[in-house]
């Protein structure tokens, strides 16, 4: 099956998580007016008694054509990925309880100035780079037992 890749926007992505960006977002000044603070851009949730981790993930580019055959989700915490050098990347997401609901399967491409924060329990494809090795600032939950993986029928990503 073919899955069309769409431009990422907060409106289109809102059921799956948050788009982390400054474009069209409110800010306030701090540090004697030298800094614009774009405050609270994503809902970060960490359940149970684990801690929030800030990491850097170095992702390798995926082979083309890109075929999706599994999704994962994290029931105990959100997961955010922010490219550190302005790279474009692709995300694949779906809703669903015990298994991904393929009627909600969507693919999005960022504009190079966006990150994403997956809500808890949102099915998504594991992180990969789009066109070159990409470093992602990653904010997620430490601890174990927070990753469910499900196979899905193969989906080939299509770029318009």
Curated annotation (Swiss-Prot):
The entry's keywords: Lyase, Purine metabolism
EC number: 4.3.2.3
Claim: Lyase is one of the keywords in the record: yes
Cofactor: Ni(2+)
Keyword Lyase carried by entry: yes
Gene Ontology biological-process annotations: allantoin catabolic process; purine nucleobase catabolic process
Reactions catalysed according to its record: (S)-ureidoglycolate = urea + glyoxylate
Extent of the signal sequence: none
GO molecular function: ureidoglycolate hydrolase activity; ureidoglycolate lyase activity
Listed pathway(s): Nitrogen metabolism; (S)-allantoin degradation
Family per similarity comment: Belongs to the ureidoglycolate lyase family.
PANTHER family documented for this protein: UREIDOGLYCOLATE HYDROLASE, UREIDOGLYCOLATE LYASE
Summary of the function given for this chain in its UniProt record: Catalyzes the catabolism of the allantoin degradation intermediate (S)-ureidoglycolate, generating urea and glyoxylate. Involved in the anaerobic utilization of allantoin as sole nitrogen source. Reinforces the induction of genes involved in the degradation of allantoin and glyoxylate by producing glyoxylate.
HAMAP family associated with the record: Ureidogly_lyase (MF_00616)
Quaternary structure, from the entry: Homodimer.
Protein name (database record): Ureidoglycolate lyase
């Amino acid at each position: 099956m073919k899955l069309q890749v769409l431009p990422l926007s907060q409106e289109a992505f809102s059921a799956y998580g948050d788009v982390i960006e400054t474009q069209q977002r409110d800010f306030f000044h701090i540090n004697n007016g030298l800094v614009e603070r774009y405050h609270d851009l994503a809902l970060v949730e960490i359940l149970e008694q684990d801690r929030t981790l800030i990491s850097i993930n170095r992702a390798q580019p995926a082979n083309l054509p890109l075929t999706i055959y599994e999704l994962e989700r994290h029931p105990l915490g959100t997961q955010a990925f922010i490219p550190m050098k302005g790279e474009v990347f692709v995300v694949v997401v779906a809703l669903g309880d015990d298994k991904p609901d393929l009627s909600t399967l969507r693919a999005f491409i960022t504009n190079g100035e966006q990150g994403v924060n997956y809500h808890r329990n949102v099915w998504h494809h594991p992180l990969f780079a789009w066109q070159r090795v990409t470093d992602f600032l990653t904010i997620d939950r430490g601890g174990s037992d927070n990753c469910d993986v499900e196979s899905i029928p193969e989906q080939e990503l299509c770029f318009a």
